[in-house]
Amino acid sequence: MLTLGPLNLMIDNYMGKHSFGQWLFAVRPWSFPASAMPIIVTLAYLFWTGADMNWAFGVWTLVNMVLFHVAGNVWSDYHDFRKSVDREDTTGATTLTTGMFQPHEIRNLAIGVFVVAAAGGISLVLLTGLPLLWIGLAGAVLTLLYPLLKYNALGDLDILLTFAFLPTIGTAFVTTGVIDWSVLYIALPVGLITDGILHSNNTRDMVPDKRAEIRTLAMGLGAKASAIMYSFEVLFPFVWVVVCVIMKVMPWPVLVALVAFPIALGCSLTMLKSPREGADIILDLDQRTAKLQMVFSLLLSIAFVISRLVF
């Protein structure tokens, strides 16, 4: 009888060195709205349009996107530690700087999760068609190259593509079988807030990033301009939603997303004060922005579903 005893022993020996809570901490679950929400909003939007959807493929895409996000998170942490972007005195990821994990553990975790996500993506390609292959390849390459792009002021563009435009277009194709460019109407506002998560992080870390001799977009702009850019990223999505309702490309119930505006305004005001009061006041702004992303996107999603069922 075939057993998986040796494999199970290997997994236990590797995983058993750390608690489940430590592994969970390593993958930064608070950031998952950045990957999950674009898929959820896209599914809700397509439901509102009356598209003939494969919901099983939609859920599969959601899980796969989060797995790619996990791989990207720990892959970035590994490279940030190797390049001394993250140190004991920095406020970034602490899984390596505190000695909780060894570099090879984080590297292997990134590779392992990436392989699982890639296998899931290839399976979806076989079930849906070649267009998904090119979308998936672009996303995979951008995920792997993210550290390099981030160090050369292109991280924000990478995130906008990887966590907004590509997943929304890909989700539309996977669930309906066609490329639906109208999903870009929802990709932009959701993607801008996602970019705000990264931008708040990079604005906070400008001093240690300069010491590590990397160049982020926030560093190029400077503290004041970075604060203005962040404010645009979290506030403009609300303007966009209103304009889309006026243009009748979104149903009027999506205006309920404006309920999240006070959260966005609070985040913006905090960032705008940071050039005067210092980076300490934005230590948790990336997490606050992720919460904004979740609230804004869930409200949009609920509105699309209600619009289809009720109005």
Each model region followed by its residue ranges:
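Small-residue-rich segments of transmembrane alpha-helices in multi-pass membrane proteins
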Residues: P33, M37-V41, T95, D158-F173, ...
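Membrane-embedded alpha-helical segments that form the functional core of polytopic membrane enzymes
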Residues: I39-V41, G50-W75, L133-A140, L144, ...
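Functional transmembrane core segments of multi-pass inner-membrane proteins
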Residues: I159-A212, K224-I228
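Extended hydrophobic alpha-helices typical of membrane-associated regions
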Residues: I246-S307
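Multi-pass membrane catalytic core of lipid/isoprenoid biosynthesis enzymes
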Residues: E88-L127, R215-M250, Q287-F296
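Topogenic membrane-insertion module of multi-pass membrane proteins
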Residues: L2-W60, N152-D158
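Intramembrane alpha-helical segments
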Residues: G16, T94-S182
